[in-house]
UniProtKB/Swiss-Prot annotation:
Transmembrane stretches, start-end: none
Domain of life: Eukaryota
Family classification: Belongs to the LCL2 family.
UniProt-listed InterPro entries: LCL2
Originating organism: Candida albicans (strain WO-1) (Yeast)
Known function: Probable component of the endoplasmic reticulum-associated degradation (ERAD) pathway.
Annotated keywords: Signal
Name of this chain's protein: Long chronological lifespan protein 2
Signal peptide: 1-17
GO annotation (BP), single: ERAD pathway
Keyword Transport recorded: no
PANTHER family, per the entry: LONG CHRONOLOGICAL LIFESPAN PROTEIN 2
Amino acid sequence: MFQKLIVITFAIALASANIFDFLNNFNTGGRQQQNQGVRTPQEYESVVLNSQCDKYLCPDTGLCVEAPKFCPCPYPSSQIRCFLPDGRFVCISKPAGEGISEKYNDPKTNWKIDAKDDNIRDCGWVNRAWRGLV
């Protein structure tokens, strides 16, 4: 009886795995999906070298801007740009959570917000970390 139960369980597991594998192949056309945003180094180099930008070409986004400080983050819907005391900037993930994430949606003001809480990683936290206070 116990052996029959093991055999039946194994057969069900095997059938389930095959069904899910079939559905996965059916949805992707039998091939691996590729990230369309990733370029090869050669393609990236070609884009940079053939750019018609006469100012500053942002390395992360390929946008032509007046100066490096105007480069946007590569993923503006989920990142904020925090300026460092030396004039450079870093892009970090927007803080998330109930009642917190809405404050960081406006790119014109989100870099000014400091929650003054070391558990919330915003631009205020970045500046405190830069100064060694975290």
